[in-house]
Swiss-Prot record:
Lineage summary: Bacteria, Bacillati, Cyanobacteriota, Cyanophyceae, Synechococcales
Reaction(s) this enzyme catalyzes, per UniProt: (2S,6S)-2,6-diaminopimelate + 2-oxoglutarate = (S)-2,3,4,5-tetrahydrodipicolinate + L-glutamate + H2O + H(+)
InterPro entries according to UniProt: Aminotransferase_I/II_large (IPR004839), DapL/ALD1 (IPR019942), PyrdxlP-dep_Trfase (IPR015424), PyrdxlP-dep_Trfase_major (IPR015421), PyrdxlP-dep_Trfase_small (IPR015422)
Keyword set includes DNA repair: no
TM ranges: none
EC id: 2.6.1.83
Protein's recorded name: LL-diaminopimelate aminotransferase
Quaternary assembly: Homodimer.
The keyword Transferase belongs to this UniProt entry's keyword annotation: yes
CDD domains: AAT_like
Length: 408
């Protein structure tokens, strides 16, 4: 009989979002007429920006001609897209990131998982708690952890708490870690990292020869001009960080699929006594395992940076952040303790009356027909918290707030 990857058996009962779907399905089967409002999974709801749609339509027509047809594209992404990303997202902010250091992909979730392909299993790893579950689960799947304890913490991983007690700041650890996952603006808490905090992290990483995996998928939602959008705004980050970005939330590409990862050419790792270039390893990995993002989609992503695209993206981001403000202001006025929802599209709510995260999930589902995300699904430090997403229509967000406020 064929042998399986037994590391998958270490995973807790189910990935957070499939478990949410299971409970919704069970509830809906018993209550088929319930008008559910979903503020749980962070999927966008508004249409693709017009500039992106028009660019993709033109690309489709181009592909229908003999001269314009394109087959396999470069695994790293088309040069014209990488150049426009470099100029707009990095050089314009004082970051020394070239087009060659940008790898276009079909999702930051995929990249933050696949990056483990080029990193050794002996690395000492730290994650924040609460944490985006993908960071943890992919380390489990690839044999980098032991079993989970009763609260879901895996042996072999170290957890850095970010909570109301420490101002949702990821404190610099005293121990040495080889690999550190940071996500700011943070999913799920909505917290941000100041320039001073990121300077401290880069200093720590350089002193300890550590690698920071920096998830900046929500950088477009930052309102505070003092908050960095990229870790590469910090001097020295080129020597100790990889950054993941996505068009999913700012441009509505969750179903279209386009993202990118930045790996500076100056970034190094160790293989025994040999010093190795991480850029070359990732380039080799992508060339072997990835066929690239479609030409049509990349033309749509390129349009994000056009004059019209920038205006439309700004409007789209503002729409979702207005939703976040509606959530935060209504729940705060009703007596809930609410964090985030200022520089990120997520509100992180303290559950009332010491309810557990899943009990509050079931309570809102049954009493208000509103779906959110239990904080405990993001780690032990998320117990007693609940995440609501701003990704929905204005009508649904306002209706959901009316229902929840009535329950308080």
């Amino acid at each position: 009989m064929v042998k399986v990857n037994a590391d998958y058996l270490k995973l807790k009962a189910g990935y957070l979002f499939p478990e949410i779907s299971r409970r919704i399905t069970e509830f809906s089967s018993k209550n088929p007429n319930a008008d559910l409002i979903r503020l749980g999974i962070g999927d966008v709801t508004e249409p693709l920006p017009l500039a992106c749609r028009e660019a993709m339509k033109a690309a489709i027509e181009e592909m229908g001609t003999k001269d314009g047809f394109r087959g396999y594209g470069p695994e790293q992404g088309y040069k014209w897209l990488r150049e426009i990303i470099s100029e707009n997202d990095y050089i314009s902010r004082g970051c020394e990131i070239s087009a060659e250091e940008i790898f276009v992909s079909d999702g930051s979730k995929c990249d933050s998982s696949n990056i483990l392909d080029i990193l050794g299993k002996e690395n000492k790893i730290a994650v924040t708690d609460p944490v985006y579950p993908v960071y943890v689960d992919t380390n489990v799947m690839t044999g980098r952890t032991g079993e989970a304890n009763s609260v879901g913490e895996y042996k072999g991983l170290s957890y850095i708490p970010i909570n109301s007690e420490n101002g949702f700041e990821a404190s610099i650890p005293k121990d040495k870690f080889d690999l550190i996952y940071l996500c700011f603006p943070n999913n799920p808490t909505g917290a941000v990292a100041t320039k001073e905090q990121l300077v401290s992290w880069v200093k720590y990483a350089k002193e300890n020869n550590s690698l920071i995996l920096f998830d900046a998928a929500y950088e477009a939602f930052i309102k505070d001009e003092s908050i960095p959008h990229s870790i590469f705004e910090i001097e020295g980050a080129r020597d100790c960080a990889i950054e993941f970005r996505s068009f999913s939330k700012n441009a509505g590409f969750t179903g279209t699929r386009c993202a990118f990862t930045v790996i500076p050419k100056s970034l190094k790792g160790k293989a025994g006594i040999e010093t190795v270039d991480l850029w070359s390893l990732w380039n080799r990995r992508q060339s072997t395992k990835f066929n690239g993002v479609s030409y049509v989609v990349q033309r749509g992503a390129e349009a994000v940076y056009s004059k019209e695209g920038k205006t439309q993206i700004k409007k789209l981001v503002s729409f979702y952040m207005d939703n976040a403000e509606i959530i935060k202001s209504n729940l705060t006025a009703a007596g809930f303790e609410v964090f985030g929802a200022v520089n990120a599209p997520y509100a992180w709510i303290k559950t009332p009356k010491d309810m557990s995260s899943w009990d509050f999930f079931d309570f809102l589902l049954e009493k208000a027909n509103v779906v959110g995300t239990p904080g405990s699904g993001f780690g032990a430090a998320g117990e007693g918290y609940f995440r609501l997403s701003a990704f929905n229509s204005r009508e649904n967000v306002e209706k959901a707030m009316q229902r929840i406020v009535k329950l308080k």
